[in-house]
């Protein structure tokens, strides 16, 4: 009973709870329904009200209303309040447009104060409401301006409308209410306008104008009309002028308006009178004063992206070009702000491509994105930046240096005309280079005297820092900057004179001290040196030989001698003192700059001499010390060899080269030792098919085998092995014969240059089957000759040797400079085009080259479509370089690459990089000096009874010394060794050694030395008079076979005849 009662009670309570909850839910539902109904009714009511209001507004703006032009200002005010009350941009844009037109129409009414919309500002009851209303209307105009696209015709009309609204109500000059008696109201109205403008500025007015200007101007074809651009720029200026050029308003003006891409360019083209307003308010000076403060400049740059900082800089430079007087007075500030903006941009410049970089057409790889508008305007921005290195600005910046006079000697030196070999006569050149002209000495010698902390020096240093920063920041237009800086012929010589005057002693010591000082002053001085080197290097690179040696543009040859001496010492000290070893950043850039200028001068001197003997050597560097350091793997010694090997005497470098080869041979096991013999490769060559057999058997050999010992056995025309054992001699003959045949122009693998007949790959060598493999084989044979120290009489064209050394990969390499070594007449014709004063199009040239190839005229386009592009005064320099590059590189690119590949498979590139072009030729073909007979006599070996005191031998040396000319002595050497030039290191290094053997019989009967032949030769016993026989030779053994003549006159006659007829090219 009790349990049942408890159960019933629980059930009852639970049921009561459920009923209570249901009542609460129902009540909540009813309350929610009421709320929803209220919202729906409210929405419907609002919608109905909005619809009614919009209908009322639409009725108000009906176009066919005859009273529409004379609506009262109050009516417009009331309808505007209603529109603003429910305004939605997408839904009410047309109504807003009509409102604006109605307001502007009311402002144009004549003598009807009640119609003028602005008249409500004079009503005490409505003034505040009217001000608030016009603020809202104008800001909605700004909102529309941010969205409209100027390139669309309908949008451009709306832009004009909304700009007109902004122009009208931010300035009282067009308000008719202020005419006559209303003039007294102007101060109050001006105050209202200032209040309105302040409101707009607080809400981002300058951002709106920036968007509009950028959207309308930063495009392939600007689409802002003159009126629109004038209105927008006038609106931008108003707050600044009204605030009397307050810093608070100059800052946003610079950030938002002056950073619009190429704005000043567009203003000068479309509405130049706006620039007059800028000039009348001296705006450029105010900008300079604001930005020269480092903190403010940094703030502006950080507010802009790097790209827009560049736009700001371009606009300021353009303004500066229009206001030279301001720049003259504010040079220091202008230089400072330009340097700071460039430094800010440089922070985002990257050296290489990555996932985080974007390509910028001026800055290169850039760590910020580049928007479409900027890309479209980049050509205009670049033109603005060009003002920085334009002549007017350079004259203003460097006025202190350019105003100095360089004293000239009474008769300026003029170089002699170049010889056919394009070599300046050394005697006359050196005489001119060291004329004792006091005025020149004063210019060139590092006299010192100027305090480096003086205002004058600091100003020049700051300017040099600016231009050096521009070179490292604006990487893609670097050449343009260098060209602009070198345009004035006297700037660089005067800058060099200025550098020579710095410090207590001037010259080298000051700059070496700067390397060890990490002060701002030292960095600025080194930046000046870098700028001088970069510009001078660029200038000398683009000048041809006539301009350098004869016209002596910018630098006299005497100056180049002094500059090269300074650079040589500076680079050597940087390396030897250990500065380069760990160099990075600015120090590394300095070294690259100075070293680059040095090597341009050195290579030009190698091509055509202008320095005295031993000018490039360092007297304080002993080769023995350097070689000891190389053996110890000292870094500085390796760097000397890498960067400035020319400071070591040539003979020592050749010794070093031979040492390197020997060490490699030892490493590869190619040298015979007491415990092992090197592997020998045996080849059999048919004498009638020497080239073909040599090619087939050697081209398959491995690199190791090619460097090793190769033994040759010749087979004659009958198929019989020729007698004789090859102990390098037969291989030497084989190598010389192969090289002689492949370099024969008749084979058409190689051609000779006009004039001096030097060899280079034939452009038509492709007619040979497998011609590239042939060139690779030739490269291996040439490399093998150099590797073994076998000199071969193969004179190469200078430009081809440059390619063999890899000089053509240098950024400073100029094809035009090397062109005379290919075709001096063609070079003269091209340089005459450069100097042509008339209209070059009259010559009818195109960017193409017509060539007669085996009877057919072939047109080679220098660039794609070049045959349709005429050569003009603007592109003639490009034409000259393209033509030179085509003749010396493009035409023979594949052949050259194949030969270099073969050559480098034997000779490592780093081995020969320590030689200049002429030195490489000497390494290949021997010394071009006269034959040293005493050295030859000292290293001659005698056989067959001959000895140093034998009368025939005494006659021989006397004839060579007294009776033969230098040319005949060269012919004699070629007769015996097959090469007319002596070995580079002297005859001690001739392998096999120079030998003379007494012979009593003809070559076909000669069996070599026997006891009888030796005794007969020694005691001058003859079987018969050999007077009818000629001397012969075995070039493979460097052996002269000399009959035992009875008279000196007979020896002289026979020897002269033999060498002139070259009868001795035979095999023993």
Curated annotation (Swiss-Prot):
Record field: catalytic activity: S-ubiquitinyl-[E2 ubiquitin-conjugating enzyme]-L-cysteine + [acceptor protein]-L-lysine = [E2 ubiquitin-conjugating enzyme]-L-cysteine + N(6)-ubiquitinyl-[acceptor protein]-L-lysine
Phosphoserine modifications at: 419
Gene Ontology CC annotations of this record: glutamatergic synapse; mitochondrion; postsynaptic density
Modified residues (N-acetylmethionine): 1
Active site: 1036 (glycyl thioester intermediate)
This enzyme's EC code(s): 2.3.2.26
Keyword presence, Transcription regulation: no
Key words, A-Z: Acetylation, Disease variant, Intellectual disability, Phosphoprotein, Synapse, Transferase, Ubl conjugation pathway
Pfam families: HECT
Stated role: E3 ubiquitin-protein ligase which accepts ubiquitin from an E2 ubiquitin-conjugating enzyme in the form of a thioester and then directly transfers the ubiquitin to targeted substrates. Ubiquitinates BCKDK and targets it for degradation, thereby regulating various metabolic processes. Involved in the positive regulation of neurite branching in hippocampal neurons and the control of neuronal spine number and morphology, through the ubiquitination of PPP3CC.
Protein name: Ubiquitin-protein ligase E3B
The gene coding this protein: UBE3B
């Amino acid at each position: 009973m009790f349990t049942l009662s408890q159960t019933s009670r629980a059930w009852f309570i639970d049921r009561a709870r459920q009923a209570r909850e249901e009542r609460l839910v129902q009540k909540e539902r009813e309350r929610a329904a009421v709320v929803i109904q209220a919202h729906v009714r409210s929405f419907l009511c609002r919608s109905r009200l909005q619809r009614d209001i919009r209908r009322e507004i639409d009725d108000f703006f009906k176009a066919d209303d005859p009273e529409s032009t004379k609506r009262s200002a109050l009516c417009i005010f009331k309808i505007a309040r209603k529109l603003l009350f429910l305004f939605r941009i997408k839904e009410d844009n047309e109504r807003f447009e009509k409102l604006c037109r109605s307001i502007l129409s009311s402002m144009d009414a004549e003598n009807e104060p009640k119609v003028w919309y602005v008249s409500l500002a004079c009503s005490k009851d409505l003034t505040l409401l009217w001000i608030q209303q016009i603020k809202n209307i104008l800001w909605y105009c700004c909102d529309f301006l941010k969205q409209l696209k100027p390139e669309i015709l309908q949008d451009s009309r709306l832009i004009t409308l909304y700009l007109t609204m902004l122009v009208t109500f931010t300035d009282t000059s067009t308000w008719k209410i202020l005419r006559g008696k209303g003039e007294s109201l102007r101060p109050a109205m001006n105050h209202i306008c200032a209040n309105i403008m302040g409101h707009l500025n607080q809400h981002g007015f300058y951002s709106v104008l920036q968007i509009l200007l950028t959207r309308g101007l930063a495009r392939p074809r600007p689409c802002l009309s003159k009126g629109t651009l004038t209105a927008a720029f006038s609106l931008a200026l108003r707050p600044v002028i009204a605030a009397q050029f307050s810093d608070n308003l100059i800052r946003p003006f610079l950030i938002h308006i002056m950073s619009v891409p190429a704005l000043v360019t567009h203003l000068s083209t479309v509405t130049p009178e706006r620039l007059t307003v800028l000039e009348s308010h001296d705006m450029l000076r105010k900008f300079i004063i604001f930005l020269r403060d480092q903190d403010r400049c940094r703030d502006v740059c950080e507010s802009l992206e790097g790209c827009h900082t560049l736009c700001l800089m371009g606009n300021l430079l353009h303004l500066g070009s229009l206001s030279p007087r301001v720049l003259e007075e504010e040079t220091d500030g202008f230089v400072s702000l330009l340097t700071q903006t460039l430094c800010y941009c440089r922070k985002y410049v990257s050296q290489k491509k990555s996932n985080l970089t974007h390509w910028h057409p001026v800055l290169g790889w850039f760590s910020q994105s580049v928007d479409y508008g900027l890309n479209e305007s980049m050509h205009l921005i670049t033109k603005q930046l060009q003002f920085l290195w334009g002549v007017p600005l350079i004259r203003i910046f460097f006025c202190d240096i350019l105003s100095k006079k360089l004293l000239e000697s009474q008769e300026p030196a003029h170089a002699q005309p170049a010889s056919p070999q394009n070599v300046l006569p050394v005697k006359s050149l050196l005489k001119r280079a060291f004329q004792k002209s006091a005025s020149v000495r004063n210019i060139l010698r590092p006299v010192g005297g100027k305090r480096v902390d003086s205002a004058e020096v600091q100003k020049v240093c700051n300017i040099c820092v600016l231009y050096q920063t521009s070179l490292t920041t604006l990487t893609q237009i670097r050449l343009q900057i260098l060209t602009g800086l070198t345009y004035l012929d006297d700037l660089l010589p005067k800058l060099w004179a200025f550098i020579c005057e710095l410090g207590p002693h001037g010259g080298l010591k000051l700059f070496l001290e700067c390397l060890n000082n990490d002060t701002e002053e030292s960095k600025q001085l080194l930046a000046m040196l870098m700028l001088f080197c970069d510009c001078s290097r660029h200038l000398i690179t683009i000048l041809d030989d006539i301009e350098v040696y004869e016209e002596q543009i910018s630098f006299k040859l005497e100056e180049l001698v002094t500059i090269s001496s300074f650079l040589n010492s500076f680079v050597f000290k940087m390396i030897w003192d250990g500065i380069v070893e760990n160099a990075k950043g600015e120090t590394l850039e300095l070294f690259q700059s100075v070293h680059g200028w040095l090597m341009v001068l050195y290579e030009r001197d190698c091509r055509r001499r202008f320095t005295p003997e031993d000018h490039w050597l360092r007297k304080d560097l002993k080769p023995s010390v350097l070689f000891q350091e190389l053996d110890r793997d000292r870094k500085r010694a390796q760097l000397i060899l890498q960067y400035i090997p020319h400071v070591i005497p040539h003979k020592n470098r050749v010794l070093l080269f031979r040492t390197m080869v020997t060490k490699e041979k030892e490493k590869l096991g190619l040298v015979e030792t007491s415990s092992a013999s090197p592997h020998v490769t045996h080849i059999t060559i048919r004498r009638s098919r020497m080239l073909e057999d040599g090619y087939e058997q050697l081209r398959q050999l491995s690199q190791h085998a090619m460097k090793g010992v190769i033994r040759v056995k010749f087979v004659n025309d009958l198929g019989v092995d020729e007698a004789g054992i090859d102990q390098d001699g037969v291989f030497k003959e084989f190598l010389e014969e192969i090289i002689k045949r492949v370099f024969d122009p008749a084979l058409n693998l190689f051609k000779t240059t006009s004039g001096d007949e030097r060899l280079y790959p034939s452009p038509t060598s492709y007619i040979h089957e497998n011609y590239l493999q042939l060139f690779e084989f030739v490269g291996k044979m040439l490399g093998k000759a150099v590797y073994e120290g076998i000199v071969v009489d193969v004179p190469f064209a200078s430009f081809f040797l440059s390619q063999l050394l890899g000089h053509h990969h240098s950024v400073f390499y100029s094809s035009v400079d090397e062109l005379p070594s290919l075709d001096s007449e063609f070079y003269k014709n091209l340089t005459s085009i450069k100097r042509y004063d008339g209209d070059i199009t009259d010559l009818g040239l195109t960017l193409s080259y017509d060539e007669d190839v085996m009877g057919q005229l072939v047109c080679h386009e220098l660039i794609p479509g070049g045959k349709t592009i005429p050569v003009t005064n603007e592109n003639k320099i490009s034409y000259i370089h393209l033509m030179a590059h085509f003749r010396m590189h493009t035409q023979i690119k594949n052949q050259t690459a194949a030969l270099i590949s073969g050559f480098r498979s034997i000779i490592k590139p780093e081995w020969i990089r320590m030689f200049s072009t002429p030195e490489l030729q000497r390494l290949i073909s021997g010394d071009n000096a006269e034959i040293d007979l005493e050295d030859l006599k000292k290293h001659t070996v005698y056989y067959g009874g001959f000895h140093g005191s034998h009368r025939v031998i005494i006659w021989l040396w006397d004839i060579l010394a007294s009776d033969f000319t230098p040319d005949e002595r060269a012919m004699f050497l070629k007769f015996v060794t097959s090469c007319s030039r002596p070995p580079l290191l002297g005859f001690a290094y001739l392998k096999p050694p120079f030998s003379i053997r007494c012979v009593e019989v003809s070559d076909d009967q000669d069996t070599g030395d026997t006891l009888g032949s030796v005794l007969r030769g020694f005691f001058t016993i003859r079987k018969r008079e050999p007077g009818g026989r000629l001397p012969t030779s075995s070039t493979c053994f460097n052996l002269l076979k000399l009959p035992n003549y009875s008279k000196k006159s007979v020896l002289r006659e026979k020897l002269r005849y033999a060498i002139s007829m070259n009868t001795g090219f035979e095999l023993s």
